[in-house]
From Swiss-Prot:
Protein name in the entry: CTP synthase
Species this chain originates from: Bifidobacterium longum (strain NCC 2705)
Active-site residues annotated for this sequence: 393, 525, 527
Enzyme class: ligase
GO cellular component terms attached to this protein's record: cytosol
């Protein structure tokens, strides 16, 4: 543990590392923060992570996936930024709602306090009231058993929206002291092909802008598409007044899982340990080295399609993609993810063409009627051709609708989400969600969210894959399998292989293995609990089934 000495007594201090970004967005601040966190964790240091998002939305739960990408759900039901998924996967930890803070949350709380009279008549201002609230969120995860909090500040230095967050970070350093706080700035060193030169000026200007806000970075992570020589690093060290040891190069890598190794070889984690006075232990590479061996030296290769409606922005399915890849790692297989627009699969011919040369499909979650007929068409094709299929959330609902229409003969089977007055709503609005759907309540943070238990049926494929009949998974939905149709589904051959403990909510469905080798769906989002070093059993099972399908061709 990290201690601060006061006379003869010692007080634990949770230290802070702030990760900022400059020049352009999408440099990989989240992956840099995650990789540094992984390295510190591998040195025996207890690390938690956090993302501060400058947008005014309270959370990303109501944002368009094409704008924001995936909404990542935590164990306690927070709808968060996709970077929280990177943090959990790299550190192999469960984070809470404290891990994601937005401008909307900050202003909402400050205005609540103002209306309640908690500021005792003060004129409420950005400084100190907004910044104090930000600081309290920054420190919310600090405790006696947490050594370091790594906080990623979203956006790019110079954005007007992020200035209160940067000011709050500056004040945290002032409050805790420079020995307990560190700033890591991620910047771009672009290559100008016409001049055949790498340019340092953008980084110099980015650091200058950061200094104008009262922050001098302690370390620079320089992103580039080719290695930087020592003379460029030395120049940046001099011009930006950063120790030479703190200037590291993170060149583009074949896999995101290579980034911890790159930063280690550049010495970033050792530099951070020294600067913050953390206990020095060697990095335990055993688990990560095994992962990299599976990433770079697979024994098999297989194609799996994601049939979705947001495929133009792959980040909308980031955790699904990473979970599929992790399922490949479990089987020493490289998985080539094929992106298939659901609309292409609305007809039998379209599905056959779109899913040609794939050995498995995933039907991910989503909202709204667009693309639903294509998802149903893809599942019909997979069921009839014995193509391995895994449905997630809306994927389960699509599987139930498809089976009801084409096997049970309920031609007008549908979901009340898509057809509120349908005669056969095999998928119905959850009772507690009806007022929300009717417009009588807030849409934000009102779905069935977070971790819930399920009981699996003995002898089912899902119970075999999990190795237990008691599981918990994370959820994000308003609709469920209509209990009035459960007996009819069972009698028609669709196995309800997992339910909520009270037996009301259908959590898993599947076809018996003598009917189909792998036709499984869950109402949950198991992708959120997958780790590259601990692949989720459903995704590992899908990849294994895909390899078997490939071998049988």
């Amino acid at each position: 543990m990290v201690r601060r000495t006061h006379g003869n007594s010692q007080e634990h201090v949770t230290k802070h590392i702030f990760v900022t970004g400059g020049v352009v967005s999408s440099l990989g601040k989240g992956l840099t923060a995650s990789s540094l966190g992984r390295l510190l964790r591998s040195r025996g240091i207890h690390v938690l992570q956090q993302k501060l998002d400058p947008y005014i939305n309270v959370d990303p739960g109501t944002m368009n996936p094409f704008q924001h990408g995936e909404v990542y759900v935590t164990e306690d039901g927070a709808e968060t930024d996709l970077d929280i998924g990177h943090y959990e996967r790299f550190l192999d930890v469960f984070l809470s709602q404290k891990a994601n803070v937005t401008t909307g949350q900050i202003y909402q709380e400050v205005l609540r306090k103002e209306r309640a009279g908690e500021y005792l008549g003060q004129c409420v201002q950005v400084i100190p009231h907004i910044t104090n609230e930000i600081k309290s969120r920054m420190r919310a995860q600090a405790s006696d058993d947490v050594d370091v909090i790594i906080t990623e500040i979203g956006g790019t230095v110079g954005d007007i929206e992020s200035q209160p967050f940067l000011e709050a970070a500056r004040e945290v350093r002032r409050d805790l002291g420079p020995d307990n706080c560190m700033f890591v700035h991620v910047s771009l060193v672009p290559y100008i092909s016409a001049a055949h030169e790498l340019k340092t000026k953008p980084t110099q200007h980015s650091v200058m802008m950061l200094r104008q806000l009262g922050i001098s970075p302690d370390a620079l992570v320089l992103r580039s598409d080719r290695p930087l020589n020592q003379s460029i690093k030395d120049k940046i060290s001099l011009m930006c007044d950063v120790d030479a040891e703190g200037v590291v190069n993170c060149v583009d890598a074949p896999s995101i899982y290579d980034v911890p190794k790159i930063l280690f070889e550049e010495g970033l984690d050792a530099y951070v340990v020294r600067e913050l006075g953390l206990p020095f232990h060697d990095v335990d590479w055993d688990e990560w080295a095994d992962l990299l061996e599976r990433v770079h030296h697979p024994k098999h290769e297989v194609n799996i399609a994601i049939v979705g409606k947001y495929i133009d922005l792959p980040d909308a399915y980031l955790s699904v993609t990473e979970a599929i890849k992790a399922g490949g790692f479990a089987n020493w297989a490289k998985v080539n993810v094929k992106w298939v627009a659901a609309d292409r699969c609305e007809t039998t011919e379209g599905a056959a063409a779109a899913l040609d040369n794939v050995d498995g499909i995933v039907i991910p979650g989503g909202f709204g009627i667009r693309g639903i007929d294509g998802k149903i068409g893809a599942l019909k094709f997979a069921r009839e051709t014995k193509l391995p299929a895994l449905g997630l959330c809306l994927g389960l609902q699509s599987m139930v609708i498809e089976y009801s229409r084409h096997v049970l003969g309920i031609e007008d089977a549908n979901s009340s989400e898509f057809e509120p007055d349908c005669a056969n709503p095999v998928i119905a609005t959850m009772e507690e969600q009806k007022d929300i759907v009717a417009g009588k309540g807030d849409m934000g943070h009102t779905m069935r969210l977070g971790s819930y238990p399920a009981e699996l049926e003995e002898g089912s494929l899902v119970a075999e894959l999990y190795g237990t009949t008691h599981v918990t998974e994370r959820h994000r939905h308003r609709y469920e399998v209509n209990v009035a149709y459960k007996d009819r589904l069972r009698e028609g051959g669709l196995r309800i292989s997992g339910q909520s403990p009270d037996g009301e909510l259908t959590e898993f469905v599947e076809l018996p293995q003598d009917v189909h080798p792998f036709y499984v769906a869950t109402q949950a989002h198991p992708e959120f609990k997958s780790r590259p070093t601990k692949p989720h059993p459903l995704f590992a099972g899908l990849v294994k089934a895909a390899l078997d399908h490939q071998a049988a061709r």
